[in-house]
Swiss-Prot record:
Induction: By methyl jasmonate (MeJA). Induced by abscisic acid (ABA), and drought and salt stresses. Keywords: Jasmonic acid signaling pathway, Nucleus, Transcription, Transcription regulation, Ubl conjugation. Residues 196-231 form the Tify domain. Interacts with COI1A. Interacts with COI1A and COI1B in a coronatine-dependent manner. Coronatine is an analog of jasmonoyl isoleucine (JA-Ile). Belongs to the TIFY/JAZ family. This is Protein TIFY 6a.
Amino acid sequence: MERDFLGAIWRKEEAAGKPEEHSDYRGGGGGASAAMQWQFPATKVGAASSAFMSFRSSAAAAREEDPKEAAVFDRFSLSGFRPPPRPSPGDAFDGAAAMKQRQFGFNGRQQYAAAAQHGHREQGVDSYGVAAPHHFPSPSPSPRHPVPFGHANPMLRVHSLPNVAGGSPYRNQSFSVGNSVAGSTVGVYGGPRDLQNPKVTQMTIFYDGLVNVFDNIPVEKAQELMLLASRASIPSPPSAARKSDSPISAAAKLTVPEALPARQIVVQKPEASVPLVSGVSNPITIVSQAVTLPKSFSSSNDSAGPKSGGLPLAVTPLSQASPSQPIPVATTNASAIMPRAVPQARKASLARFLEKRKERVSSVAPYPSSKSPLESSDTIGSPSTPSKSSCTDITPSTNNCEDSLCLGQPRNISFSSQEPPSTKLQI
């Protein structure tokens, strides 16, 4: 069985004059209409609709010639498209049911009466935007909309923007029936937004003991100020650390020139001399206490002459050490370095000093007698007390030397090692 594609066989037989044999031909779908055929309506529609192809049967072409049927048929046609031929009465989807179903829009009301009155146009914009009558002319005055939409349907309203720079209103091409903004629910989020008037409030700033209140400050400006304040507070710890380092370096710079005239010693590492300040302060107080004690007063005065003669610069820095701390730092470093050069000269000088002192004590008071309380403690003993008195006189000097040992003067170490031969003298 051969099939008829595009009505080729029917056209041949119609040209031969036999159209009645194929009147009951059912083309594929089982309908009672004739075969479908391709047509390109380029004459009526124009150049713009030449791209659209429509299926029309011979019955539809014959019906187009009648203006009454064309008015009814054109009412249910799309722009540029033609519906399929009407099915037979025995079909499940008959034409009457289809026409009755198409008379209702989305909201359940008949729309053709309103469409005939209003024409579905507002501000020159058609409901479909493409099928306007001025685009596709039709012989009938009825609109060419198969499913028109009502004005009261809120789901199909689209906002129309205000006038553009050119002055012409913006046109929406699909489902635009109005440009109302207040009654529409499409495209609105959270109510109307006022971007020109943002939220403003008061801002209070506490700075330098003052309270500053500013009115009408937006939230964005307040956030920017807070961000700037947080950034400005970050680099403060490094700057404080740099400031704390500066006094140490300044003190180190001050100690070096003060130490040069005293000992003529260049301190190469001033950092090592800084921690010694706390350790040197205690020996200074010990020396001052030792000088004020009545027991060691005479011995310190006696020992001041030979010591100052041997090393004249050893006592003067100590007398000047009490007002300021950087000076004893330099003197202790100098005194710790210099005594290494003259250990033997100290030993001989100390031995001679002790011998002369013992001779003076024995010549002045060979026997015990009532003396002042300062000297009675040194001379208490039996009649043979020259050696004992000499030993007791040595002890304050040794205590004074031990006190001076804390200042970094190791000259008393040699004296303690040579104490037995120097003190025991046979008469």
